[in-house]
Regions:
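Long, contiguous, secondary-structure-rich segments that constitute the structural scaffold
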Residues: 157-160, 164-215, 277, 281-297, ...
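Flexible, glycine/charged-enriched surface loops at secondary-structure junctions
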Residues: 9-18, 179-186, 529
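Short beta-alpha connecting loops at secondary-structure transitions
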Residues: 130-132, 136, 146-158, 283
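Catalytic alpha/large subunits of respiratory electron-transfer oxidoreductases
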Residues: 1-137, 171, 175, 227, ...
């Protein structure tokens, strides 16, 4: 629309690259995609010749390589013999993840560079390389508006970890390309990058940072953020043969329609406080407070039709695979649609494996997989018992049909469900020590607490009904300064009544939903800012502000009903 109306390139009227990754633009700049050369050049014959000459590389690639989904298909077909994976977890994050795992399992050589030792992908690695994490890296980052910024390390390198550029250089030198990879520091690479951007450019290519081709090390260290490319298109000129823009018609691929066997449409995405496959954010108990378990969100009308209630276990199935989730009934979806989060993996859960579910269909131009419209069906599961375990130390074995673990303050919370005698589960999961327990065979309940010098070190609560105490108070007892009594521990609550804060909404300030709703109601608050002034909620990172706004709206509706 901005192009057709002649406003393209003016402030507020520019294309926005919805890439999802903070340095995706930087990846394009340096040719980090299989479909591009370095310095924002494509595989046109003249560009291949230019880069070949600049790098003195006679064996230059002359056409685009394999995109991610295609790559793993070729590995599975035996067409790719070696794979080096850096800073990603494709065994979880790609669609039809079961096929990806099959490909990794049969690939003759897999190397993985990561700052996390144990990931679903690293389990297929023949060689593991300890890489620098984000806070240990030194270099530049480019955001979506082409702003290049210096990123300086916050922490020294841990152990044998090394930056990716150093690891690549060492491998290349060992293979014989000593001169081509003789980098001593990130500034060396940046200078080469700048030289290539201006090499035989003459104004033909928008990306040109040649003014930094000879930047000194001190100047690089002190580099201030700058945006390259000026304001393209604002002058009405475009990088085409006649200088005019092109409107390219795009044929919309057909959306997946619900079928008789697959009557629902599965949408997938991320939770508010987690990122990718939780290899980093999953280490934080605070970030796990918002959602401690993988949930399938379902519209109330669909839930009623399928006789699914909140907290039920539900198997989500698609033509690609199936996985088990906890049900969350929500009117935030349209009828016929369900949503599951992408984060959970084999490392955290026996269920919640969203990567197994989407179809591996991709956009024909970008190769981007579609994760938003997979035909699916839901099946309610009825285990004999459901419950949870809390423990200071992660149990060595979790022999439950359904189990998902999450870090909490001073320990772990493991949600469990299954069939058979739960006493066998207690024996396998709980540590040795002074034990107190209550068994109610009529209700199918088992409550066990393990103490050490009177202090709680582990507990298990399971029930046929699935109704168990709130987790938060029991979790707090793992590090309580004053030990709770045996009666309180087995009851799962303190003897003296405590205010129920409800689910945590603001992680930064530990503010619960019920606290926010009560404050909105009693003080007549009508804005997120007012809630922030009263409770501090929403005044730090800001990710909970939409949730607070919804609570304000819901409270106002209830008041005027």
């Amino acid at each position: 629309l901005h192009l057709a109306s002649g406003r393209i390139g003016k402030p507020g009227a520019a294309p926005f690259s919805i890439t999802g990754q903070p340095n995706a633009m930087g990846g394009r700049e340096v040719g980090g995609l299989a479909t591009t050369l370095a310095a924002h050049m494509d595989y046109a014959e003249e560009n291949v010749a230019l880069v070949r000459r600049f790098w003195a590389a006679p064996r230059m690639a002359t056409k685009p390589g394999l995109k991610a989904v295609d790559l793993f298909r070729k590995i599975r077909e035996g067409r790719v013999k070696a794979l080096w994976i850096m800073a990603t977890n494709p065994a979880v994050s790609l669609p039809d993840a079961g096929l990806v795992r099959e490909a990794l399992a049969q690939c003759p050589f897999v190397a993985v560079s990561d700052c996390i030792a144990d990931t679903d992908t690293s389990r297929f690695a023949h060689v593991m390389l300890p890489a620098a994490g984000w806070g240990e890296k030194d270099g530049t980052v480019t955001n979506s508006e082409r702003l290049i910024s210096r990123q300086r390390a916050l922490f020294p390198l841990a152990g044998e970890a090394r930056p990716d550029w150093w690891i690549i250089s060492q491998v290349a030198q060992a293979m014989g390309w000593t001169e081509a990879f003789a980098y001593d520091r990130p500034a060396d690479i940046y200078r080469e990058h700048a030289r290539l951007s201006t090499y035989r450019n003459g104004g033909k290519r928008l990306f040109d940072i040649g003014h930094h081709a000879a930047i000194s090390n001190p100047a690089y260290d002190a580099l201030e953020p700058f945006r390259w490319g000026g304001t393209p298109f604002a002058d009405g000129r475009f990088p085409t043969s006649d200088g005019k823009a092109r409107l390219v018609p795009v044929a919309q691929m057909g959306q997946a329609k619900p079928l008789a066997r697959w009557p629902m449409t599965l949408n997938t995405g991320r939770y508010r406080d987690h990122w990718h496959t939780m290899t980093r954010t999953g280490l934080s108990p605070k970030l796990s407070q918002h959602r401690r378990e993988p949930m399938v969100e379902i519209h109330p009308a669909d839930a009623a039709e399928l006789e699914i209630a909140g907290d039920d276990l539900v198997q989500v199935s698609t033509p690609q695979g199936d996985s088990v989730f906890r049900a969350l009934v929500s009117d935030g979806l349209r009828r016929g649609e369900v949503f599951t989060p992408i984060h959970w993996t084999d490392r955290q859960s026996t269920g919640g494996r969203t990567g197994l579910l989407p179809r591996p269909l991709v956009d024909p131009v970008s190769g981007q997989p579609g994760f938003k419209s997979t035909p699916a069906r839901l099946t309610k599961l009825v285990p004999e018992w459901r419950g949870f375990v809390i423990a200071r130390a992660l149990p060595h074995a979790i022999p439950a049909a359904y189990a998902t673990k999450v870090r909490v303050a001073q320990g772990w919370l493991i949600e469990v469900a299954g069939d058979g005698d739960p006493a066998l589960l207690a024996k396998a999961m709980l540590p040795k020590g002074e034990r107190i327990e209550v068994v109610d065979e009529a209700r199918g309940e088992l409550r066990v607490a393990v103490l050490e010098d009177g202090q709680l070190v582990a507990a298990m609560f399971v029930a046929r009904s699935g109704r168990t105490p709130s987790r938060d108070w029991l979790i707090a007892q793992l590090s309580a300064a004053v030990p709770a009594s045996s009666v309180e521990l087995l009851a799962g609550r303190p003897a003296a009544p405590q205010a129920d804060r409800g689910p945590i909404v603001c992680v930064c300030f530990d503010v619960g939903m019920k606290t926010i709703v009560e404050t909105i109601d009693t003080q007549g608050l009508i804005s997120v800012e007012a809630v922030g002034q009263a409770l501090s909620a929403g005044t730090s990172c800001g990710t909970c502000r939409p949730a607070i706004q919804r609570l304000i709206g819901a409270t106002q509706e209830a008041t005027h009903a």
